[in-house]
């Protein structure tokens, strides 16, 4: 039996100082087992159906056709108006309150 030994000088003579990215030995590719496939795939039978049997709408309804751009603009406006803290109670707090008696008295006063 003869032993073949590769030396560093042989690889540098070829101009290939980098080690090969090819794996040495055999590579075994394992397919996922049936149990793992079932865990990875979400159930498709009852997606979007609530326990009560009603269909849940996630997000905005699908709109197709020429009205798509108008729908997207309207949806953008609704999102802006529905920002947290923009409810009617907040708007009332921002509006100034006037004491009508003081306003009327100020209007009747003469310089």
UniProtKB/Swiss-Prot annotation:
<protein>
    <recommendedName>
        <fullName>Putative G antigen family E member 3</fullName>
    </recommendedName>
</protein>
<feature type="region of interest" description="Disordered">
    <location>
        <begin position="1"/>
        <end position="67"/>
    </location>
</feature>
<comment type="similarity">
    <text>Belongs to the GAGE family.</text>
</comment>
<feature type="modified residue" description="Phosphothreonine">
    <location>
        <position position="97"/>
    </location>
</feature>
<keyword id="KW-0597">Phosphoprotein</keyword>
<feature type="compositionally biased region" description="Polar residues">
    <location>
        <begin position="8"/>
        <end position="24"/>
    </location>
</feature>
<dbReference type="Pfam" id="PF05831">
    <property type="entry name" value="GAGE"/>
</dbReference>
<dbReference type="InterPro" id="IPR031320">
    <property type="entry name" value="GAGE"/>
</dbReference>
<dbReference type="InterPro" id="IPR008625">
    <property type="entry name" value="GAGE_fam"/>
</dbReference>
């Amino acid at each position: 039996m003869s032993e073949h030994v590769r030396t560093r000088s042989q690889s540098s003579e070829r101009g290939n100082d980098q080690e090969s990215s090819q794996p040495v030995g055999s590579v075994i590719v394992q397919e996922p087992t049936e149990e793992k496939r079932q865990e990875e795939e979400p159930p498709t039978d009852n997606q979007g159906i609530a326990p009560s049997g009603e269909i849940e709408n996630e997000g905005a309804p699908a709109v197709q056709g020429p009205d798509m751009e108008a729908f997207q603009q309207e949806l953008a406006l609704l999102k802006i108006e529905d920002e947290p803290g923009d409810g009617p109670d907040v708007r009332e707090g921002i509006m100034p309150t006037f004491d009508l008696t003081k306003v009327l008295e100020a209007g009747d006063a003469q310089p």
